[in-house]
């Protein structure tokens, strides 16, 4: 039992260091944990290819790679025409490759503990990582000894403290909130579609608890988390309504309704109680859910951040920049954080369309690999375009992971249409 817990904790750290990359104080700032996992992924790929006797890459990954190259080339054209030196997205193909090989590193690590790494295993580890980040963020904020220990090895703590922001081990600000949102969408997918979850009240409660913790604490780390909370809750609610097929209410449906209802009541009661008795938790909720408190108290749904964001909708004033951009994005040079504005200034509408097509393809190609994935693909697509209204972002990490793991759609021959990105070896479960 202890051995399994240790293995599980190590695997959770591997997933966390990939999803929430960190820079170490004792290494050059350009090196982060995701790169180490990517190197491990390359070695695992080479080993698996030699063992299998061939190097295989799925057609979906090749197509995604071609689209990433196209975007990088277009960005190169943009900065060349504009005679600028900002290569932020010119090197996107390298980011793509790092995320993909890192995802295979995560997959290879999980395979050491599980014979087959499927979507259920991946989502459970993502949920565990989300909870881990939230718990460590609270510990860092409330215990100076723990905070000092983390800051001794991980870069960034001093900046977040000066900014009065809650942070975890790699989870902070909008990038952290966006990754929390992706995790919430995937939790909702597992809750809504997986029969092993639907038939197990403990699994349902565990996932709902993880979802709730990420919603509450994750929103304090970054209010962008609420985007994933809204999308995830909408999917869970839709799935509960959809259970009633043919006009009949079954015992299983009633059990699911009761579990969901009591879980939500418990979370609400917990939040109200600690909001009343804990000054720290009171501050957390006031910050994370500022818009809702403002709406309840003043009738206006707004936050300080949205007020600032409203002033950042700036656009080019010449047709050439609208079309191909002017190759500027770094260091707030465009006077905006908004993703759409920055993409247009950097690579124009054409570049924005290429990048949008890349994410649409990556999200929707998984529909052929995973059962009941259409709504999830739609939510991931919606998440991509919603958060661009606030910041430039990249959620390819989840697509890279989905490219690597085993699929669950059956072909006509009865075999899983897995289309793994890279070859798999059969390892025994420890």
Region locations from a protein language model:
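Alpha-helical transmembrane segments of multi-pass inner-membrane proteins
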Residues: 120-148, 171-221, 226-239
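N-terminal signal-anchor transmembrane segment
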Residues: 1-52, 73-81, 398-401
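A juxtamembrane structural motif centered on a specific transmembrane helix
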Residues: 1-7, 48-53, 197, 248-259, ...
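Transmembrane alpha-helices of multi-pass inner-membrane enzymes
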Residues: 43, 187-189, 233-236, 377-385, ...
């Amino acid at each position: 039992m202890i051995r399994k817990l240790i293995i599980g904790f190590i695997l959770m750290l591997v997933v966390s260091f990939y999803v929430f990359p960190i820079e170490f104080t004792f290494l050059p700032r350009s090196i982060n944990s995701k790169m180490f996992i990517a190197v491990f992924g390359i070695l695992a790929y080479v080993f698996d290819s030699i063992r299998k006797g061939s190097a295989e890459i799925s057609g979906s990954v090749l197509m995604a790679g071609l689209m990433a190259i196209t975007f990088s080339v277009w960005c190169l054209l943009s900065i060349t025409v504009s005679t600028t030196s900002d290569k932020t997205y010119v090197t996107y193909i390298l980011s793509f490759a790092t995320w993909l090989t890192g995802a295979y590193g995560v997959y290879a690590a999980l395979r050491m503990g599980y014979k087959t790494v499927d979507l259920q295993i991946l989502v459970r580890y993502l949920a565990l990582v989300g909870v881990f980040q939230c718990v460590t963020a609270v510990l860092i904020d409330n215990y100076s000894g723990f905070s000092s220990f983390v800051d001794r090895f991980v870069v960034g703590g001093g900046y977040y403290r000066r900014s009065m922001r809650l942070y975890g081990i790699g989870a902070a600000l909008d990038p952290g909130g966006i990754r929390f949102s992706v995790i919430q969408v995937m939790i909702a997918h597992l809750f809504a579609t997986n029969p092993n979850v639907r038939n197990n009240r403990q699994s349902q409660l565990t996932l709902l608890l993880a979802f709730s913790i990420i919603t509450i604490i994750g929103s304090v780390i970054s209010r962008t988390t609420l985007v994933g909370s809204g999308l995830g809750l909408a999917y869970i609610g839709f799935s509960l309504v959809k259970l009633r097929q043919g006009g009949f209410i079954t015992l299983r449906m009633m059990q699911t309704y009761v579990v969901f209802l009591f879980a939500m009541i418990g979370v609400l009661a917990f939040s109200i109680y600690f909001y009343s008795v804990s000054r720290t938790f009171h501050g957390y909720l006031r910050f994370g859910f500022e818009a809702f408190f403002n709406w309840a108290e003043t009738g206006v749904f707004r936050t300080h951040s949205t007020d600032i964001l409203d002033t950042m909708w700036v656009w080019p004033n010449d047709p050439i920049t609208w079309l191909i951009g002017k190759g500027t994005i770094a260091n707030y040079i465009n006077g905006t954080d908004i993703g759409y504005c920055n993409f247009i200034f950097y690579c124009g509408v054409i570049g924005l369309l290429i990048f949008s097509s890349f994410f649409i393809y990556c999200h929707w190609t998984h529909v052929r690999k995973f059962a009941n994935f259409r709504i999830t693909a739609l939510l991931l697509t919606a998440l991509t375009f919603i958060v661009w209204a606030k910041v430039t972002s990249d959620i390819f990490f989840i697509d890279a992971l989905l490219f690597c793991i085993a699929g669950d759609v059956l072909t006509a021959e009865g075999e899983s249409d897995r289309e793994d990105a890279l070859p798999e070896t059969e390892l025994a479960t420890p």
